[in-house]
A protein has these predicted regions:
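Alpha/beta catalytic cores of nucleotide-metabolism and tRNA/nucleoside-modifying enzymes
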Residues: 214-235, 239, 245-301
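Hydrophobic faces of well-ordered beta-strands that scaffold small-molecule active sites
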Residues: 17-20, 40-44, 96-100, 123-125, ...
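Short, surface-exposed connector motifs at secondary-structure boundaries
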Residues: 12-14, 91-96, 156-161, 232-236, ...
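N-terminal capping/small domains of soluble enzymes
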Residues: 1-96
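Short gly/pro/ser/thr-enriched loop/turn and capping motifs at secondary-structure boundaries
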Residues: 48-53, 130-132, 194-197, 268-270
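Active-site mouth loops of central-metabolism enzymes
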Residues: 14-27, 72-74, 97-108, 162-171, ...
Length: 301
């Protein structure tokens, strides 16, 4: 059989397929459909230093070939997460990647420090959160702020740090270079694209928050392009995501330069998506007589 193992900053994954934060919880519900042991990693929903209530409803609406969400990173906080979610995930033979959110550098660092002695494998830092100190502009939309938050997090982190990049910028490579300069171990991209939908019958916004994050198949070409650009701009390993629903989608990201892939919105319309994608990649390697998945990373130049 072709080799599916990939390495992210010293963390060995049995295959390159993982979940995308916010679409899989911590796997408790999906474990009824998917054998979590078969995943390269489970990426948890965002966790903050204190509970976050999230945004008012409606929070989700469908779009052509995708969806908009404005959940607002609702989560129970780090204490509940450590007591409830980590013990559940430790029952499985898969890597645990904790997504961390915050409204200030102090918020992020509190969570990162708390996770230092927990049995988790990597940390993914969601820099699409609004920076309260800078008037609500997301950390990931300002290269200087991104470099600084990366440096701060790295001071406290005992696990490798993944910086999750926002696509809502003029130049994604500038952000990637800033995260690399700050000491990031891995980059993940893309987060959702900011979008809006109007309910014409009610003459108001479809989402209470007015705007939301767009995800699903419609964003894939943008995501593949950005992964390709970043792979050619920095030397860090990349986790690619954005509209992946099939093995063919995942392979596009890998060939563009991603070492691993995250499956998000597809989990909502197909709970078996992650394992089907892993099986599909394996079948492709066998059919193409490729001995090792790593041979395909960044093959397009």
């Amino acid at each position: 059989m072709s080799r599916m193992n990939v390495n992210l900053a010293g963390v060995e994954l049995k295959n390159p397929v993982m979940t995308a934060s916010g679409t899989f919880g911590s796997g408790t519900d999906y474990s009824e459909f998917v054998d979590l042991n078969r995943l390269g990693a489970v990426v948890t929903k965002g966790v903050a230093n204190v509970p976050w209530p999230g945004n008012p409803t409606p929070r989700v609406t469908e779009t052509a070939s995708g969806m908009l969400n404005a959940i607002g990173l609702q989560n129970p906080g780090i204490d509940v997460f450590c007591e409830r979610d980590i013990p559940f995930l430790k029952k499985y033979d898969t890597k645990i990647i904790v997504n961390v959110c915050g409204k200030s550098a102090k918020d992020y660092c509190e969570v990162v420090e708390r996770l230092g002695n927990e049995p988790v494998d990597m940390l993914e830092i969601n820099v699409s959160c609004p920076n309260v100190k800078e008037g609500g502009i997301a950390f990931g939309q300002n290269p200087k702020a991104l470099e600084e938050i990366t440096k701060e997090v790295k001071k406290y982190a005992k696990q490798p740090v993944i910086m999750k990049l926002s696509p809502n910028v003029t130049d994604i490579t500038e952000m990637a270079k800033a995260a690399e300069a700050g000491g990031a171990d891995v980059l993940s991209l893309i987060n959702t694209l900011t979008g809006m939908k109007i309910d014409i019958n009610r003459r108001t916004f479809a989402l209470a928050n007015k705007t939301g994050g767009m995800s699903g198949p419609a964003v894939k070409p943008v995501a593949v392009r950005m992964v390709y650009q970043v792979a050619n701009a920095v030397s860090l390993p990349i986790i690619g995501m954005g509209g992946i629903a099939t093995a063919e989608d995942a392979l596009e990201f890998i060939m563009a330069g991603a070492t691993a892939v995250s499956v998000g919105t597809a989990n909502f319309f197909n709970p078996y998506a992650t394992v089907e994608i892993a099986d599909g990649i394996q079948a492709f390697l066998e059919k193409q007589k490729v001995e090792d998945i790593n041979e395909l990373i960044g093959v397009v130049k």
